[in-house]
Amino acid sequence: FIIGFDGEKDGAGHRIVDFVTRTGIPAAMMGMLQALPKTALWARLEREGRLIQGEDAAKGVNQTNLLNFKPTRPIRDIANEYVDAFCALYEPNAYMDRVYSYYLKMGAPRWKAAAKLPSLVDLKALSIVVWRQGIKRSTRTRFWRYLFGMARNNPALLEQFLSVLAHNEHFLEYRSIVQQEIREQLESLPPEEPTAQKELQPV
């Protein structure tokens, strides 16, 4: 999901979170729009004088970087919506709800892998998930309810369910990185000039 398109209305971040929640997508990738060199978007923005970095500085990384052009609405509004939405998507309870909903709807796999003993790495990962999500955090009640729900209703996907729950340990760390790096970039921006749209509004 991308935020920062021309003509985008306020609340785009909230609409993305609402859509992901209603559809039950477990891991939703999200970023701010970046113009890449030698693309039609880059050429148009260059003609319009809206690029704010040259080709050498264009990174293409859209999760921890601000837009590299002047958008049609305040960049601070877009950035704050993005950070709020990213954090909401990977809030532990919300993420767990989506993962459970997703795996309950999935049918059992048509093939069955050969049974094997879990490795030490697997056991360590499982212990981390159980400790953090099933004991330490506010997700503890959900965790055990959903775990037993999966074991009862879709046991063939129980291992995958736990594996995807474990992914949120990475996303939770990445949330902090996104917040910090975007906030630092916002602090370094000069004050924004009023947009033409605001200037034309009646007094």
Tell me what each language-model feature is.
Residues 104-105, 112-203:
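Terminal low-complexity segments of carbohydrate-biosynthetic enzymes
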Residues 1-126, 130-137:
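A structural motif corresponding to the C-terminal lobe/cap of the Radical SAM core domain
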